[in-house]
Design a protein with these regions (language model features):
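Structured functional modules or segments
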Residues: 1-72
Length: 72
């Protein structure tokens, strides 16, 4: 388990918003697990259709965090 963060710090804008274009390798959020901040990158290019987790919410391993419309 970990904690989902939508931005690099509380005063910053989110990494991504609904409707944003993202490229493979772009950081889309941070998940804190065991006091380590892990930057999560998107695996393929596309458009963010939905953010499925609220900021600062607990998340589990393999939980889906975003809905992405592939640009392939």
């Amino acid at each position: 388990p970990g904690t989902f963060y939508s931005s690099p710090d509380p005063d910053s804008a989110p990494f991504v918003n609904i409707g944003d274009n993202v490229n493979a390798g772009d950081t889309v959020c941070i998940v804190e697990a065991m006091k380590i901040m892990n930057e999560i990158q998107v695996e393929e290019s596309g458009i963010i259709e939905e953010v499925l987790v609220e900021n600062s919410s607990p998340v589990e391993f393999d939980q889906v965090l975003f809905k992405l419309k592939s640009s392939k």
